[in-house]
Curated annotation (Swiss-Prot):
NCBIfam families: PRK10128.1. It comes from Salmonella paratyphi B (strain ATCC BAA-1250 / SPB7). Binds 1 Mg(2+) ion per subunit. Its EC number is 4.1.2.53. GO terms for molecular function: 2-keto-3-deoxy-L-rhamnonate aldolase activity; magnesium ion binding. Catalyzes the reversible retro-aldol cleavage of 2-keto-3-deoxy-L-rhamnonate (KDR) to pyruvate and lactaldehyde. The record marks R74 as: Transition state stabilizer. It catalyses: 2-dehydro-3-deoxy-L-rhamnonate = (S)-lactaldehyde + pyruvate. Substrate binds at Q151, A178, D179. This is 2-keto-3-deoxy-L-rhamnonate aldolase. It is an enzyme of class 4 (lyase).
């Protein structure tokens, strides 16, 4: 099978395109497919905070596959064994949470590449990613088409940002606003002026280093700020939050209810 692996999301980052995404936390392939028909450039399937199993991730990749939206998987952690499974089910773009040091970044790079570039385990004959052994020269193509994003979301990571940006094999750095603001002493307050200043500075440093800069902003005004600061892959909502907002707003049309605010500004 002479198929060529391509990764439109990675190609867009290389060109500097602005790509707008949506966070998927509902854990269902049905909701993933609905989102894929909306036209977002990328869809983040969350395995860190949403209760997704590897098989759940697999089914959502299948649901998104017929559409133009590009899937990004965030596993619960950056362990070598888990990364191997997630890549084998067909993920081409990974977002690895809680990367605090350059050494962690190097370990993740190694886990995502086949030898001699890394230590990814070989099992193409049983992998959806290789069409069960039918893609010629799969290992080399996989190394080339893989897109690796890491999350910087702590004070320690901020201190090590420049070193992380120097790690070869990292395509982009994503600022995790919720954990970052908590680490800086402003829990649930990513809109604090000091946090905003740091986010803007980080985006500038990431782009200056030749990497893509990413962000999740559930507040449209914050999303626009990040785009203006230079972030080029930005998620502008979370499916479960949009669903609860819609439910609450519709109920409020007919009943006087007390519910959570529909204008939550942080993840």
């Amino acid at each position: 099978m002479n198929a060529l692996l391509s990764n439109p999301f990675k190609e867009g980052l290389r060109k500097g395109d602005t790509q707008i995404g949506l966070w998927l936390s509902s854990t269902t392939s049905y909701m993933a497919e609905i989102a894929a028909t909306s036209g977002y450039d990328w869809l983040l399937i969350d395995g860190e905070h949403a209760p997704n199993t590897v098989q759940d991730l697999y089914h959502q990749l299948q649901a998104i596959a017929p559409y133009a939206s590009q899937p990004v998987i965030r596993p619960i952690e950056g362990s070598k064994a888990l990364i191997k499974q997630v890549l084998d089910i067909g993920a081409q773009t990974l977002l690895i949470p809680m990367v605090d040091t350059a050494e962690q970044a190097r370990q993740v790079v190694s886990a995502t590449r086949y030898p001699p570039l890394g230590q990814r385990g070989v099992g193409a004959s049983v992998a959806r990613a290789a069409r069960w052994g039918r893609i010629d020269n799969y290992m080399a193509q996989a190394n080339e088409s893989l897109c690796l994003l890491v999350q910087v979301e702590s004070k320690v990571a901020l201190e090590n940002l420049d070193a992380i940006l120097e790690v070869e094999g990292i395509d982009g750095v994503f600022i995790g606003p919720a954990d970052l603001s908590a680490s800086l002493g402003y829990p649930d307050n990513a809109g604090h002026p000091e946090v905003q200043r740091i986010i803007e500075s980080c985006i500038y440093r990431i782009r200056a280093a030749g990497k893509a800069a990413g962000f999740l902003a559930v507040d449209p005004a914050m999303a626009q700020k990040c785009l203006a600061w230079g972030a080029n892959f930005v998620a502008v909502g979370v499916d479960t939050m949009l669903y609860t907002e819609a439910l609450d707003s519709r109920l409020a049309m007919f009943k006087s209810v007390q519910s959570v605010s529909t204008a939550k500004r942080s993840y």
